[in-house]
Structures are given as C-alpha cells and as structure tokens.
Amino acid sequence: MAGRSGDSDEELLRTVRLIKLLYQSNPPPSPEGTRQARRNRRRRWRERQRQIRSISGWILSTYLGRSAEPVPLQLPPLERLTLDCSEDCGNSGAQGVGSPQILVESPAVLDSGTKE
C-alpha cells in the first residue's frame, strides 16, 4: 500500500494527482446571469462536487486500501483544558494577537477514552 512505511510513494502521488484533477475539472460557477440561472448553476456544481467526493473516496479505498474519512482523534474533556495567557498577552497593544497556550492536566488523558 502506498504511503505506508517502507513502500513507494509513487502510487500515492499518482492517486493524489488524479483526485486533484477531478476537483480542478469542476470550477466554481460564474456569478453572471439571473438569480435563477445562478441558483441552478450552483445547484449543479454542488451535485458534481458530491459526485467527485464519492469518486475520490472510492479511489482512495480501492487503490490505496484506506478510508476516505480521517480517523477520529480522541480529545480530552473540555473541563480539563485551560488557556494560559500569562505570556505575550497585552504586551503588543493589539487584543487577540498571539497564540495562547493550551495546557492539559496530564498526558494520561489522551491514553484512553474511558472515564476514571
């Protein structure tokens, strides 16, 4: 399977190029025309996008043996997350600028999805 450790990435790159070509073959609709014409073009475009999405999923699962959907990430409970704004907050004069740190109580939170 391409993309796995020890395997060639050629098949993965070829598959990505094919999926990219599919999406490029369906550009967004033009904003010209009457409201009804624009609505119809958007509706047809969305339907083609849905078809491309399903074809892309089929290509990924058939040629690469993997799911089109990402593996869900197990996140810790929100009650255990805190924002630490002790660094770089208010120093620059612009509110909301900077990257607040997210502190997690303990790394053991990410180990299992069961509650204690």
Swiss-Prot record:
Region of interest called Homomultimerization, as start-end residue ranges on this chain: 18-26
Ranges of biased composition (kind: Basic residues): 36-47
Name listed for the protein in its UniProt record: Protein Rev
Short motif (Nuclear localization signal and RNA-binding (RRE)): ranges: 34-50
Entry comment on modification after translation: Asymmetrically arginine dimethylated at one site by host PRMT6. Methylation impairs the RNA-binding activity and export of viral RNA from the nucleus to the cytoplasm.
GO cellular component, one term: host cell cytoplasm
Subunit and interaction comment: Homomultimer; when bound to the RRE. Multimeric assembly is essential for activity and may involve XPO1. Binds to human KPNB1, XPO1, TNPO1, RANBP5 and IPO7. Interacts with the viral Integrase. Interacts with human KHDRBS1. Interacts with human NAP1; this interaction decreases Rev multimerization and stimulates its activity. Interacts with human DEAD-box helicases DDX3 and DDX24; these interactions may serve for viral RNA export to the cytoplasm and packaging, respectively.
Keyword Phosphoprotein tagged: yes
InterPro entries attached to this UniProt entry: REV_protein
GO molecular function: DNA-binding transcription factor activity; RNA binding
Alphabetically ordered keywords of this record: AIDS, Host cytoplasm, Host nucleus, Host-virus interaction, Methylation, mRNA transport, Phosphoprotein, RNA-binding, Transport
Any one GO biological process: viral process
Pfam families for the chain: REV
